[in-house]
């Protein structure tokens, strides 16, 4: 897609498709503008291009822009670190039209578990009009810990992305994490 006619901007907020992502990233890189993206289903080459772009622009990519999910990432990483040897399973449920399975959020929760030393297994359910539910289970003989987040309204994702865009504007080039930007935020 040709985006050269797009007016000037401080931050691009992109929740499009993997096929449109390259043009948005190139526009931001060329203009030296920040990018907030929640586009999932990106290829390894697209993730590599995004990593290369952080040398010249600030980028925040997240699979989910909910403040609750940002906190859940931290809790999952900490639980994995504190519970070595426990099984880690991630169960995610979304509406029937969601195409990627496991979801980008489930995969990044798995990355958080891996940072803490756990290897996650995934189960995906597509049913009805569910906005998004993620449960991370840590289990061992005789006990289970379950960390869960349920989104009941899609507005939370837009609010989180706009908040992230305001905080990312003017930041130095680099890959920024949602949870770092939200750290000082109080609802």
Spell out what each predicted region is.
Residues 17, 39-40, 65, 95, ...:
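Short loop or secondary-structure boundary microenvironments that flank
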Residues 19-31, 38-61, 67-79:
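Rossmann-fold NAD(P)-binding glycine/threonine-rich loop
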């Amino acid at each position: 897609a040709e985006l050269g006619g797009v007016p000037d901007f401080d931050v691009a907020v992109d929740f499009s498709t993997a096929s449109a992502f390259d043009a948005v990233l190139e526009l931001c890189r060329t203009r030296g503008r920040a990018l907030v993206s929640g586009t999932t289903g990106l290829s390894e080459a697209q993730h590599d291009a995004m990593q290369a772009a952080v040398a010249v622009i600030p980028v925040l990519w997240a699979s989910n822009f909910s403040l609750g999910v940002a906190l859940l990432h931290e809790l999952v990483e900490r639980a994995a670190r504190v519970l070595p040897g426990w099984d880690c399973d991630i169960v995610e449920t979304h509406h029937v039209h969601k195409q990627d399975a496991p979801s980008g959020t489930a995969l990044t929760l798995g990355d958080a578990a891996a940072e803490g030393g756990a290897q996650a297994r995934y189960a995906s359910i597509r049913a009805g009009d569910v906005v998004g539910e993620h449960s991370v289970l840590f289990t061992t003989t005789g006990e289970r810990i379950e960390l869960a987040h349920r989104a009941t309204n899609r507005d939370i994702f837009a609010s989180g992305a706009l908040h992230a865009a305001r905080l990312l504007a003017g930041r130095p080039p680099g890959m920024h994490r949602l949870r770092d930007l939200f750290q000082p935020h109080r609802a």
